[in-house]
């Protein structure tokens, strides 16, 4: 998703992004 690129730069955001 979109959040995939953010997860690479900020691993902390992954829980608030695609994982949910």
From Swiss-Prot:
UniProt-listed GO biological process terms: tricarboxylic acid cycle
Main localisation: cytoplasm
Enzyme Commission designation: 1.1.1.42
Cofactor (UniProt): Mn(2+); Mg(2+)
GO CC terms: cytoplasm
One function term, GO molecular function aspect: isocitrate dehydrogenase (NADP+) activity
Further remark: On the 2D-gel the determined pI of this protein is: 6.8, its MW is: 32.3 kDa.
Family indicated by similarity: Belongs to the isocitrate and isopropylmalate dehydrogenases family.
Protein's recorded name: Isocitrate dehydrogenase [NADP]
Taxonomic source organism: Naegleria fowleri
């Amino acid at each position: 998703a979109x959040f995939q690129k953010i997860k690479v730069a900020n691993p902390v955001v992954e829980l608030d992004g695609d994982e949910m």
